[in-house]
Amino acid sequence: MKRICVIAVMGAGLMWPCAGSAEILALVNYESKSEEALKAFRSPVPGQRRQEGIAVIDVDPASPNFKKIVETIPLPADLVAHHIFYNRDSSKAYVTALGKAELRVIDLSKRPFTAKTVAVPDCQVGEDVVFSADNKRWFLTCMGSSKLIIGDGVTDQPIQTVSLPQPYPHGIAIHDGIDRVLVTSTVRATDLKDAGEHITAIEASTGKVLSSYKVSSKPSPAGDAPVEILFVPGANPPVAYVTNMFGGTLWTATWNAQKKDFDVAQAFDFATIKAGVPLEIYFNGKSDRLYVTTAKPGHLNIFDISKNAAKPELLKSIPAGEGAHHVAVTKDEKLAFVQNSLLNLPGMSDGSITIVDLAKGEVIGSIDTLKDQGFNPNCIVLLPQWNHPAGH
């Protein structure tokens, strides 16, 4: 972790780095908690006025500014900013939005941070973004309009709209080596119903839709809601993991080079550990550990995949908060920060950030900065100098 000190600029309410002490800075987008959740606060809190923003928080337990917000990027109160993704060289951050047909793009080389608005008129309920290996194109899933938007990675303008055969695209993964993009079919955005059961393969170079694969062993309609998907870095043959949000299972999609197609199979059932709502997927640097969050109850689950990716071995389930969702990992892979909130849903919106010592496999602290102000964090990533991509 970088050694710096912080000088408070009182008039601007900002803090700026110079030489002296430790810090790890994270980007955390947030929104006000639900009206029902806000009733629990006995005293007035800022979140009671509908707000959104991206907070830059010092998450280093060794820092004198631990838990402090050192900078804020304001966002419209009706944007419903959802995820934050870095492009391949981590020069820009892309922020998706559930409430507007827009992307926010942040130039990470300039402080204080500002967000450029990019209109994506064909995209309703923007979810996930991935980038081609050459950083020249981005791919955005749109759960409300059932589209995949392909954009220019330099100008950030949309250049192609792909209509998908399966509705409600959410999770997305790309593998340039086999020229494939995989997209999940999740749920109807308006009411979280009509759950999907497929993933769809698209030719990455052209945007041509190729095939769809059912990732459930139940009779249709299975209602399993595949939500996230991610390729294991460096795996040969290529293999991607899929989390089924409502089905409570983990599946694999393994590339069959002879058929130029994917074989899908169930890899793990979270019901065996009395966990549900599996969400995000991450890997360690060696790609022999798989991390999966489960929102109910909130846990960070660690699997050994060194022997057989098709049969991940659960090593430990580390308690986090209700709604355990996104995870940020430090470059040295010593610490993980688990953001605990899912769509402001009851029972899955704790609002804290759990700090996990990955070497010990235990919780060492919690950051309640946003929670205590009546906000829920929706995503977390560390700034590039501290961030491990964890397969993303």
Predicted region positions:
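Gram-negative bacterial Sec-dependent N-terminal signal peptides
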Residues: K2-A19
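Predominantly soluble domains enriched in secretory-pathway, periplasmic, or organellar proteins
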Residues: C18-H392
